[in-house]
């Protein structure tokens, strides 16, 4: 791009694992490596040091890292990291952070991130709660046909009891899932603020040779829990949740 004035940085990999990616990057620019000793920054040209977080470019950022992961270990950076040129990338980041980056690449060698999200099926879990708790069943029946005004206290109690039961089941089932999956992982990061009806949101750092076993465990869980839960399972991914790498000079 003739108007390009800056370099967008996706992540860092070993120089001998870096591969060009034609037209794969943000703004459909080609991804090229900027080497420094054993390291390489994965970059593409951009017009400005500010890159808006548009959906297509967020996807391209993830896809570039995913392709790089096929060829070797990669340390991902968050979306939007831009350097003025290859010289500043080396002098302000790769050189001063060299020892740290090498250490991180060695730490994450042969490891990938797998993302698991589990959600209750709303109708199924509510039916389960009603069936398991006679008081909730009676309250539900008592408030079903009556007016809101006349049964207001009962409705409040019903809501509180259902919420408490759902919370108890969420915590219990979350631990069951974690116990089954974490034994296959090197490390786990659990989302601290799950959304409604979410049982688990977690990222697992897994050795590549154990990914197949993790896949099998996920398939078994999905089959066992199919009547009451559904899952979203992504990976292998670059280890975003575990690297925590910023682009500030060190």
Locations of the language-model features?
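An interfacial alpha-helical scaffold signature
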Residues: 1-250
């Amino acid at each position: 791009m003739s108007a390009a004035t800056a370099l967008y940085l996706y992540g860092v990999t070993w120089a001998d694992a870096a591969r060009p990616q034609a037209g794969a990057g943000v703004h459909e620019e080609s991804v090229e490596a900027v080497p420094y000793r054993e390291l390489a920054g994965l970059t593409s040209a951009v017009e400005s040091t500010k890159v808006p977080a548009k959906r297509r470019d967020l996807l391209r950022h993830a896809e570039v890292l995913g392709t790089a992961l096929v060829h070797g270990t990669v340390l991902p950076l968050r979306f939007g990291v831009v350097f003025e040129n290859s010289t500043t990338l080396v002098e302000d980041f790769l050189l001063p952070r060299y020892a740290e980056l090498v250490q991180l690449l060695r730490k994450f060698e042969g490891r990938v991130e797998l993302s698991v999200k589990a959600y209750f099926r709303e109708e199924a879990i509510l039916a389960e709660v009603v069936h398991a708790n006679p008081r909730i069943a009676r309250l539900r029946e008592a408030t079903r046909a009556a007016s809101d005004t006349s049964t207001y206290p009962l409705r409040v109690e019903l809501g509180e009891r259902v919420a408490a039961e759902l919370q108890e089941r969420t915590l219990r089932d979350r631990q069951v899932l974690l116990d089954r999956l974490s034994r296959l992982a090197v490390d786990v990061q659990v989302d601290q603020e799950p959304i409604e009806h979410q049982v688990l949101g977690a990222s697992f750092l897994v050795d590549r040779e154990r990914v197949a076993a993790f896949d099998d465990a996920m398939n078994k869980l999905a089959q066992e829990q199919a009547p009451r839960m559904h899952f979203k399972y992504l990976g292998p991914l670059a280890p975003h949740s575990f690297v925590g790498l910023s682009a500030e000079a060190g």
